[in-house]
Amino acid sequence: MEYQFSINDFEGPLDLLLHLVKTSKMNIYDINIKIIIEEYLKFIESEKEKNIDIASSYLVMAAELIHLKSKMLVNDEEKEEASDDEFSITSEEDLKRKIIEYEKYKKISESLVELENK
């Protein structure tokens, strides 16, 4: 069972929130990052005895949302000066690509867990 985040009018798993941002059905500016962090810390506390891989996947998604929002809040001059390494998310399109990549690895991970449990 996935942890349910409650943010503004949204309630559901973090990967659904990322999907809504990715498909422009939810505006990143409407997301209170402080709430995501608080919810994530609650999740970590409740899951600390369980699978660290699950906790780390939520951390990656939360970090991507935080990074995208911070980039969107930076003025255009600073955006041009920002580094352009492979981990940098400088636009909503970059976030969409990262989410698609995350979803691919999440499915692979789930398949590996199923194989391991057989």
Where are these regions (language model features)?
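Long, charge-dense, low-complexity tracts
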Residues: 1-118
